[in-house]
Regions:
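Ubiquitin-like/PB1-type beta-grasp interaction modules and other compact soluble beta-rich domains
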Residues: 1-89
Length: 90
């Protein structure tokens, strides 16, 4: 199982946990597994077509998955995903 580091804004959706584990062969599978186990995360992670929301950044072992293979990026059991929602303000 891969480890997912949960940002503070999403922690209420996962019972306050800083990290959770999820199964999957690639980033998309792992995030969908997270959303299945914690349904309140689905709308924050995914758009209506199942794509990653554009304001959500996901890193696999410190590499932005958007410059890798996106949701199709392979994930190993010892890998760590970090979810970082983009911040905006003024």
């Amino acid at each position: 199982m891969a480890t997912i580091r949960i940002p503070p804004v999403l922690r209420p959706s996962v019972g306050g946990e800083r990290e959770v584990s999820a199964d999957g062969a690639n980033v998309g599978d792992v995030l969908r597994s997270l959303a299945e186990n914690h349904p309140d995360t689905r709308g924050q992670l995914f758009g209506p077509e199942g794509e990653l929301n554009r304001y959500v950044n996901v890193y696999l072992n410190d590499e932005d998955v958007r410059v890798l293979d996106g949701l199709d990026t392979p994930v190993g059991e010892s890998d760590t995903l970090v979810i970082l929602p983009a911040m905006a303000g003024g």
